[in-house]
Amino acid sequence: MSYTASNTRYATMTYHRSGNSGLKLPALSLGLWHNFGSNGNYENMKAMCFTAFDHGITHFDLANNYGPEPGSAERNFGRILREELHAYRDELVISTKAGYTMWDGPYGDWGSRKYLLASLDQSLKRMGVDYVDIFYHHRMDPNTPLEESMMALDTAVKSGKALYAGISRYDLEHTRQAMEILKELKCPFIIHQTRYSIFDRHIETDGVKSFTAQNGCGIIAFSPLAQGLLTDKYLKGIPEDSRIKTDGRFLHADQLTPESSRRSPH
């Protein structure tokens, strides 16, 4: 039986404009960094997407390298979109990113125009869509002129392959410069994605949070629960089915400290 969205999906969710743009994002988004790779359970992936959308979560956040293996999260989400969610595409905000290593050779990572635009084309193909709503540069590139990376985002938008531009994990100075470049290009730069939780509050002190607020750019957090450390999952040790035990790429046992246990809900 094909999926039909809940008739009450917009009854309780709160939506906020991203910066000064007209795009409204839900208070919670579904990030596909974990759980949607080739090692995941496809039925669980569908259930997560359906439950999210049924509760008004319209924003699905991806990146070219989400997996494992890289690209598999986009492929799996694309399959769900094609098989179950295609009728709701205009109700969804789909975002993806490029910046980390995606393929071998000198053109497979960082921030060159060649890499960013090729990666976006690959992402669109994997997901089976004509455009994404937001295309991010995923990290600062110390070896590519910032103008080149930002012009690639501008090209993505003006070609119709993305509706809005964003950046991720940029420091204050590069955020300021990126904003100036994109403003001059008249490119709709609306969002900055950064790590933010009670374990990592750097944007409150490094100037990024206040600068973006003052200049009409939205902030969206990734890992607000510190990959589960801020839940009750680890209060009694490390479960066998936990991310620390089964994956270990991004979350490690040495991050499970007495402080993290004290900050988790009891």
How would you describe each model-predicted region?
Residues 40-44, 72, 76, 107-115, ...:
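Alpha-helix N-cap and loop-to-helix initiation/capping positions
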Residues 2-12, 140-266:
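Beta/alpha (TIM)-barrel catalytic core signal, keyed to glycine-rich beta->alpha loops juxtaposed to Asp/Glu
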Residues 89-102, 193-196:
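A short, structured active-site edge motif that brings together acidic residues
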Residues 1-92, 158:
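N-terminal binding-site loop/beta-alpha segment at the start of enzyme catalytic domains
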Residues 19-37, 95-108, 131, 136:
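N-terminal small/glycine-rich loop or linker at the start of catalytic domains
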Residues 18, 30, 45, 52, ...:
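Conserved, mostly hydrophobic/aromatic
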Residues 23-28, 56-58, 86-92, 129-133, ...:
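Short, well-ordered coil/turn segments that N-cap beta-strands
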Residues 39-53, 110-127, 146, 175-179:
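Short, acidic/polar
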